Every structure is written in C-alpha cells, then in structure tokens.
C-alpha cells in the first residue's frame, strides 16, 4: 500500500513538472477551429509598474465618495494621491485640522470668507469657485465632498505638498497637535 502511494506521488510530481513545458510547446499550435479566436494569442510579460498602477487605481476606488475616513484610511488615501514623506505627514495634519478628516465637512461662514468643502476645506467663495471649477474640471462644488477628488486637487494646489500657503492652518498650534498625532510614524 505504502509502495503504491509513493508510486502515485512520483507520477503526479512528474506530470506536474512536465505540464507547463507541454503547454508552452502547444501554445504555437493554437487552432482557430472554433472561430472564437482569429489568431495566435501572445502573452506579454507583466510590467511591474503597470501592475502597481492597476492595484493603486483599485485601492483608490474604495475611497471614492466615502463619507468618513479613519486616521489610517486618510493616511493611505493621501499616500495614494501622491503625498510622500514629511509632505504626507503635513497633508494628514492639515486635513485633520481643517475638517477632522471628514469628507463631508462644509464651512459656509461668509464672515470669515468661507465656502469651503471636504477633507481639505477647499474654499470656493466668490471668484475662487468659477476659477477652480474650470481649472479642476468640476461641474459642481459638491464634487469636493469626494475625498479622492479633494485630495488630488489639494496635491495639485500644494505643488505635491511643498507649498501650503493657501492654507492658513499650517504651523498653528492645532495643526502641530495633529502633526504630532500622525499614525504609523516610522
């Protein structure tokens, strides 16, 4: 009995080793008898960069129109749209200071000159609104409640996280508190 099992294991191992070689050899003999395939299929080697981009897009899709974000989700989203290193920490702290990381945050206080939307409280007051809608191809200010859209626009407005001059909250005491609370510091 034991001897039969060993023989079967040997046969299956041999088949397992030869099957891939056999399939590669048959790939050139691809037939079109069923009329479903018009010519030989060639499999291109996967580009690691494109595989990463596909997975990045898939992960970003999970954040589309999300109505709340955990601290770690916010960090992940900001990293996916392009913030890196210290700029990522700054972006996270600004988002927490501006909206507590809430995608649906809105400040419509006209006395302070605000009509600000989303995670980064992008201000659309007065002439800023039409200008920014055109520049960022927005049909409506409401699109800024989408955390992916809001974060991508902020990444662009801050020149990749290098220029936060449009945000008065940077370097204030509340910002510094959030900066010090950044999750996942390495």
Predicted region positions:
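Secondary-structure boundary/capping signal
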Residues: 85, 103, 162-166
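Catalytic and binding regions of secreted/periplasmic enzymes and modules that target cell-wall glycans
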Residues: 90, 109-111, 117-186
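Short amphipathic alpha-helical segments at helix boundaries and their inter-helical linkers
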Residues: 95-115
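Boundary at the C-terminal end of the N-terminal hydrophobic targeting segment
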Residues: 25-27
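N-terminal Sec-pathway targeting helices
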Residues: 1-11
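Second-shell loop/turn segments in exported
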Residues: 59-65, 76-82, 106-109, 136-147
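N-terminal membrane-targeting segments
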Residues: 21-23
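Export/targeting segments at the very N-terminus of extracytoplasmic proteins
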Residues: 14, 18, 29-101
């Amino acid at each position: 009995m034991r001897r039969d099992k060993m023989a079967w294991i040997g046969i299956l191992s041999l088949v397992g080793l030869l099957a891939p070689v056999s399939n590669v050899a048959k790939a050139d003999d691809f037939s079109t008898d069923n009329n479903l395939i018009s010519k030989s299929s060639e499999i291109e080697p996967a580009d690691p960069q494109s595989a990463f981009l596909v997975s990045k897009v898939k992960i970003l899709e999970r954040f589309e129109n999300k109505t709340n974000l955990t601290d770690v989700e916010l960090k992940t989203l900001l990293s996916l749209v392009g913030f890196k290193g210290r700029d990522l920490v700054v972006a996270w702290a600004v988002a927490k200071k501006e909206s507590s990381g809430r995608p649906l945050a809105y400040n419509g206080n006209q006395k302070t000159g605000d009509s600000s939307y989303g995670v980064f409280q992008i201000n659309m007051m007065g002439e800023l609104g039409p200008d920014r809608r055109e520049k960022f191809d927005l049909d409506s200010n409401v699109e800024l409640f989408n955390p992916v859209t809001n974060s991508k626009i902020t990444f662009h407005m801050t020149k990749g996280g290098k220029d936060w001059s449009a945000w008065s909250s940077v370097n204030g005491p509340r910002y510094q508190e959030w900066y010090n609370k950044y999750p996942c510091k390495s």
